[in-house]
């Protein structure tokens, strides 16, 4: 009984004092949430909790809309539009925003348990039968199924759609759950489309766009965060494969943003304008792969400095941009890449994690000021 502390201490003490000539196997059985009914009765909740009502077990979560909830709501619309849409989770229906989908479309929802490798290959099987599978999974857990992603999906060029939650920093969940590497390990794969929205609206539009990708795998990465302003009733806007979006026109310096650091980029741009009297260009690249090469070619005409911003380790979006410039441009330009530091960052407030990794507006300005001077 793993809940009998006194017995466990006695056992450990016994074997500690005993002269052993080999390994000892202890089969210790525990039950999630034992002694607290709301936790015992909930298969997929209470693994990690915020403050909650002790009597009911209801967690006091923020009412602000999250990227995860945008995914859940948009998938319902896509499922209504296309009966081939299916969803897959590895024991995380509520954590990935699929709980409402599970209730409304039980025959098109699949929880495979804590078996990420099976989830990926299972989705590949669905894709071969002309279904449109969406695999909703945390970035850190997708790492467990990388072999299946490569061999069962990418090499076969199967149109599985990966919804990669918890990409980037995750605050209190710490280094074990940080989605630090997905851009790096997906952008190097042939036959893959990789997207990262800068807002809730962009995420909704990317989800709708992904429905039309029927010849290769795709991935949308998004953070554990709230979306800010969001109009749920707004119609879908068209997204074109591999095309970025000009947010602000300027000269000399071009910010190439990928993902939800766009507001930090805007703040850094304001600092440059106020302190150096220079209006910079800001691009929401949208795609880590394929990148908007035509846009980059056009920007070279009146920009000398290119700044990439991403919430990922080295080797991701920035590498795609660097490779393009190294192989395609004859003009002498400067490139500075902002990405996660080459270290594991422990539990902390997410704003502090940005500062530790050098992706705060102030640090961005500090680094860029070298070029301005």
Where are these regions (language model features)?
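Thiamine diphosphate
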Residues: 1-48, 57-74, 78-104, 111, ...
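Short beta->alpha connector loops at strand-helix junctions that form conserved
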Residues: 112-113, 137-138, 196-199, 309-311
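Conserved G/P- and acidic residue-centered "switch" motifs that form tight phosphate/ATP-binding loops
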Residues: 130
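Conserved glycine-bearing catalytic or ligand-binding loops at nucleotide- and phosphate-handling centers
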Residues: 196-213
């Amino acid at each position: 009984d793993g809940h009998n502390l006194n017995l466990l201490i006695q056992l450990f003490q016994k074997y500690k004092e005993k002269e052993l000539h080999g390994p000892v196997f202890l089969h210790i059985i525990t039950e999630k949430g034992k002694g607290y009914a709301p936790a015992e009765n909930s298969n997929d909740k209470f693994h990690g909790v915020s403050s909650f009502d002790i009597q009911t077990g209801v967690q006091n979560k923020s009412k602000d809309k999250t990227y995860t909830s945008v995914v859940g709501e948009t998938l319902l619309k896509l499922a209504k539009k296309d009966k081939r849409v299916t969803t897959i989770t590895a024991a995380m229906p509520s954590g990935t925003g699929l709980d409402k989908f599970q209730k409304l479309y039980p025959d098109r929802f699949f929880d495979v348990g804590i078996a990420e490798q099976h989830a990926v290959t299972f989705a590949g099987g669905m894709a071969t039968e002309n279904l449109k599978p969406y695999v909703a999974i945390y970035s850190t857990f997708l790492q467990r199924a990388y072999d299946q992603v490569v061999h069962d999906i990418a090499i076969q060029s199967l149109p599985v759609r990966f919804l990669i939650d918890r990409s980037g920093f995750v605050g209190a969940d710490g280094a074990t759950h940080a989605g630090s590497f997905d851009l790096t390990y997906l952008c190097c794969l042939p036959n893959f489309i990789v997207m990262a929205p800068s807002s809730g609206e962009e995420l909704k539009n990317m989800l709708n766009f992904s429905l039309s990708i029927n010849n290769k795998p795709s991935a949308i990465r998004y953070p554990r965060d709230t979306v800010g302003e969001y109009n749920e009733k707004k119609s879908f806007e068209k997204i074109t494969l591999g095309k970025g979006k000009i947010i602000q026109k300027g000269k000399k310096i071009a910010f190439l943003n990928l993902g939800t650091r766009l507001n930090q980029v805007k703040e850094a741009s304001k600092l440059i304008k106020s302190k150096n009297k220079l209006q910079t260009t800001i691009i929401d690249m949208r795609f880590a792969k394929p990148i908007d090469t035509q846009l980059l070619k056009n920007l070279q005409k009146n920009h000398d400095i290119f700044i990439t911003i991403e919430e990922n380790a080295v080797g991701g979006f920035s590498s795609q941009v660097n490779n393009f410039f190294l192989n395609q441009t004859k003009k002498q330009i400067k490139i500075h890449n902002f990405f996660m530091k080459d270290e594991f960052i422990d539990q902390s407030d997410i704003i502090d994690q940005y500062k530790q990794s050098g992706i705060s507006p102030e640090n961005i300005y500090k680094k860029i000021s070298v070029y301005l001077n």
